Amino acid sequence: MPKRVLQGVVVSDKNDKTVVLKVERRYSHPLLQKTVRQSKKYKAHDENNQFKVGDFVSIQESAPISKDKRWVVLTSEAAG
């Protein structure tokens, strides 16, 4: 089974070798008939501490690295 890849914005880089990302998904609500935005935060492994707050990055699923980290930062995307 392929590993999931998500895109999000770095909201915290205060931890060593860890960044916190906010991943937003949009979907159409069946009853309200409007587009709803829902976000979730993920902790991802950043080996070289190279990503800063505000960066738009891609993360990939991995084996558990710690209690909360199960994602690895792949690349930085162009913001836009």
UniProtKB/Swiss-Prot annotation:
Oligomeric and partner information: Part of the 30S ribosomal subunit.
Signal peptide: none
Purpose: One of the primary rRNA binding proteins, it binds specifically to the 5'-end of 16S ribosomal RNA.
This protein's GO CC annotations: cytosolic small ribosomal subunit
Similarity comment text for this entry: Belongs to the universal ribosomal protein uS17 family.
Gene field: rpsQ
Pfam families in the record: Ribosomal_S17
Superkingdom of the source species: Bacteria
Taxonomic source organism: Brucella suis (strain ATCC 23445 / NCTC 10510)
NCBIfam families referenced in this protein's UniProt entry, alphabetically: PRK05610.1, uS17_bact
Gene Ontology molecular function, alphabetical: rRNA binding; structural constituent of ribosome
Protein name: Small ribosomal subunit protein uS17
Biological-process GO terms, alphabetical: translation
Keyword match RNA-binding: yes
